[in-house]
């Protein structure tokens, strides 16, 4: 229904940008995008350096970078398909931190980490290939904006939060922490752990919002609902006849 709310030559200005930024209903997904990819980005940046520190040659290091990419693509396609198939976002996205937390914990606290060559490479490869929920979140933002105008802006804002997370990721591993990066891996462990309650909070938040809308909607008569559909000034995801996906 919202596809007719603007034409293809209508510009989006500062007012629309401000409204999208202040749409607190999408803040939980922005927060997810901000922290969800920090772990992968951090280790991905230093993966070749870590492999060389383990004693691999440049040629071997290049070859050993292939398995994480294959695993990453496989998980990306699989988890995105599962989310659409099950029509579920929060719980499916939980697969990512539940997969990553044990791995980064082993990488951080196992005494053989950084010393036992192939075991260390395997752990890093599995961590780098973790389920990637970016595609789920991009679609999630688009659906929960419920407006053609705000959809494009909100998607751009989401990507801005992802990029801010990437900037933070570049500053977690430090020179004084080389080569085992114990401090950095502790931070990554806490970040991955934080994603679990954040996803659960997001699920509960959208269920609560839907329940609040449902109470008001159910109090209306059919005539009142029809009048609301035609004349209400509510826009986007604030409309009572819109249900948040979670």
Located regions from the model:
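Intracellular terminal tails of multi-pass secondary transporters
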Residues: 1-6, 180-246
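Extracytoplasmic gate region of multi-pass secondary transporters
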Residues: 12-81, 134, 138-139, 168-170
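Transmembrane alpha-helical cores of Major Facilitator Superfamily
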Residues: 34, 66-70, 98, 156-164, ...
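Hydrophobic alpha-helical transmembrane and interfacial-helix anchor sites in secondary transporters
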Residues: 82, 141, 175-176
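Cytoplasmic membrane-interface "Motif A"-like loop-to-helix N-cap segments
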Residues: 84-98
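C-terminal ends and interior cores of transmembrane alpha-helices
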Residues: 95-113, 128
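Hydrophobic core of transmembrane alpha-helices in multi-pass small-molecule transporters
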Residues: 117-136
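A late C-terminal transmembrane helix in Major Facilitator Superfamily
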Residues: 148-180, 187-191
């Amino acid at each position: 229904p919202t596809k007719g709310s603007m034409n293809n030559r209508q510009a989006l200005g500062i007012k629309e940008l401000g409204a999208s930024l202040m749409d607190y209903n999408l803040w939980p997904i922005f927060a997810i995008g901000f922290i969800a990819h920090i772990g992968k980005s951090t280790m991905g940046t230093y993966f070749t350096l870590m492999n060389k520190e383990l004693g691999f040659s440049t040629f071997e290091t290049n070859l050993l970078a292939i398995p994480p990419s294959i695993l990453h693509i496989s998980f990306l396609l699989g988890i995105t398909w599962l989310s659409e198939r099950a029509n579920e976002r929060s719980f499916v996205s939980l697969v990512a931190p539940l997969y990553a937390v044990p791995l980064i914990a082993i990488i951080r606290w196992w005494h053989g980490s950084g010393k036992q060559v192939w075991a260390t490479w395997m752990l890093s490869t599995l961590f780098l290939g973790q389920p990637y929920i970016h595609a789920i979140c991009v679609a999630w933002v688009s659906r929960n904006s419920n407006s053609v105008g705000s959809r494009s802006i909100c998607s751009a804002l989401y990507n801005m939060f992802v990029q801010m997370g990437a900037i933070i990721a570049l500053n977690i591993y430090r020179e004084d922490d080389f080569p085992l990066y114990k401090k950095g891996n502790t931070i990554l462990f806490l970040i991955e752990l934080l994603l679990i309650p954040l996803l659960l909070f997001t699920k509960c938040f959208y269920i609560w919002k839907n329940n609040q809308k449902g109470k008001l909607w159910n109090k209306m008569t059919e005539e009142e609902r029809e009048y609301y559909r035609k004349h209400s000034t509510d826009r986007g995801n604030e409309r009572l006849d819109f249900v948040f996906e979670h």
